[in-house]
């Protein structure tokens, strides 16, 4: 029997009603109260997520920038200390190794945050391409990560932080902030489509921090949230999930994150030729939004048709808690990607009518 990995917060899940599942080899809470309730809490108040299963890799040394420029698609040279950047790592053919965040903590000090299911693969990929005086260290087991997300997230977190959180702008961070006396890196980032913060601390401090935040946020409606709500929230905001919208067979351009690909940066990076070609002339496939007109929910890998021609497949889909509609993301032939194109999705051996719609499905009002 495979032993599932657990985060430092595993022992407190039960106290808050956590129901755990196997998620990529991790025993993680899919929900605490209900996915719908948690989803709505994040859209209207705030939610707290344990995302300690995510991986963290430190890159340091004189050649750290040159190394990162070689292995990621975005232009790391534009990143200033205290800034975060969304990017991707690609294979030479343009397929995606992973999507990730890079935090610049110092001139020769970067923290990479990678997907849980890819930790070993990513670390090996990075370590096998390291150059010059650059070091790559997997610190995933030492670091815990909590995410507090939603319109009331800032006010709740401010109760246990002395620094003015308004000074931390979107995709910026502060290192060594004390959160209820616990040293942490606090960044204004997230995976929900709402305002919020991600908090990185030592593994041994995570449970105390989790309990404290839920305590001080209770009156504002802060709820413990699981993976189910995290998925429906990111899906509505059209944020890609590796293994669904991104994979070794899907390029960042196809997945709609071309903004994180800078083919004109000086450095030669893996996948540059393919990605440059796709960015300039268009990719053969495109990730689009689809809304089901008839009954049925589109799910991952369901085929999409026009007439008898299979034009692609669904990557993610659900009954949207916010929009109250059955919607999906689908990677389809670019010829059919125009909004209002009528398509059919095969749901349980039955063709169901759907239409291509604009994305993101949800965008918060500023």
UniProtKB/Swiss-Prot annotation:
> What keywords sit in the KW lines?
Aminotransferase, Transferase
UniProt-listed SUPFAM superfamilies: Aminomethyltransferase beta-barrel domain, Folate-binding domain
Single GO BP term: glycine decarboxylation via glycine cleavage system
EC numbers listed for it are 2.1.2.10
Catalyzed chemical reaction(s): N(6)-[(R)-S(8)-aminomethyldihydrolipoyl]-L-lysyl-[protein] + (6S)-5,6,7,8-tetrahydrofolate = N(6)-[(R)-dihydrolipoyl]-L-lysyl-[protein] + (6R)-5,10-methylene-5,6,7,8-tetrahydrofolate + NH4(+)
Tell whether DNA-binding is among the UniProt keywords. Answer: no
What Pfam families does the database record attribute to this sequence?
GCV_T, GCV_T_C
GO CC terms: cytosol; glycine cleavage complex
What molecular function does GO assign, one term?
A: transaminase activity
In terms of domain of life, where is this protein from? Answer: Bacteria
Family indicated by similarity: Belongs to the GcvT family.
Relate the assembly described in the record.
Answer: The glycine cleavage system is composed of four proteins: P, T, L and H.
Family matches, as HAMAP family:
GcvT (MF_00259)
Q: What does this protein do?
A: The glycine cleavage system catalyzes the degradation of glycine.
Q: What is this protein called?
A: Aminomethyltransferase
**What's the encoding gene here?**
gcvT
């Amino acid at each position: 029997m495979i032993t599932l990995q657990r985060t430092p917060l595993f022992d407190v899940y039960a106290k808050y009603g956590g129901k755990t599942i196997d998620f990529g080899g991790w025993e993680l809470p899919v929900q605490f109260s209900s996915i719908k309730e948690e989803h709505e809490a994040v859209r209207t108040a705030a939610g707290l997520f344990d995302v300690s299963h995510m991986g963290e890799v430190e890159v340091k040394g004189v050649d750290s920038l040159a190394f990162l420029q070689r292995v990621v698609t975005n232009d790391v040279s534009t990143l200033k200390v205290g800034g975060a950047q969304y990017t991707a790592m690609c294979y030479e053919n343009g397929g995606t190794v992973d999507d990730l965040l890079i935090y610049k903590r110092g001139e020769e000090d970067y923290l990479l945050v990678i997907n849980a299911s890819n930790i070993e693969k990513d670390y090996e990929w990075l370590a096998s391409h390291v150059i010059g005086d650059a070091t790559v260290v997997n610190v995933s087991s030492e670091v815990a990560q909590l995410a507090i997300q939603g319109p009331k997230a800032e006010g709740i977190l401010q109760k246990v932080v002395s620094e003015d959180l308004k000074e931390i702008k979107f995709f910026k961070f502060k290192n060594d902030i004390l959160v209820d006396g616990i040293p942490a890196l606090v960044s204004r980032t997230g995976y929900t489509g709402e305002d919020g913060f991600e908090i990185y601390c030592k593994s041994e401090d995570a449970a105390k921090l989790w309990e404290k935040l839920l305590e001080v946020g209770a009156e504002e409606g802060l709820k413990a949230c699981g993976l189910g709500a995290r998925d429906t929230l990111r899906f509505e905001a059209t944020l890609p999930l590796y293994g669904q919208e991104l994979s070794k067979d899907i390029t960042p351009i196809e997945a709609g994150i071309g903004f994180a690909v800078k083919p004109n940066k000086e450095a030669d990076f893996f996948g540059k030729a393919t990605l440059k070609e796709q960015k300039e002339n268009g990719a053969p496939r495109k990730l689009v939004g689809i809304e089901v007109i008839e009954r049925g929910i589109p799910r991952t890998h369901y085929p999409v048709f026009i007439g008898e021609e299979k034009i692609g497949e669904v990557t993610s889909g659900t009954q949207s808690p916010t929009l109250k509609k059955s919607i999906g993301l689908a990677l389809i032939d670019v010829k059919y990607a125009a909004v209002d194109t009528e398509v059919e999705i095969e749901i349980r051996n039955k063709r169901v009518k759907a239409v291509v719609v604009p994305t993101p499905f949800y965008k918060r009002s500023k």
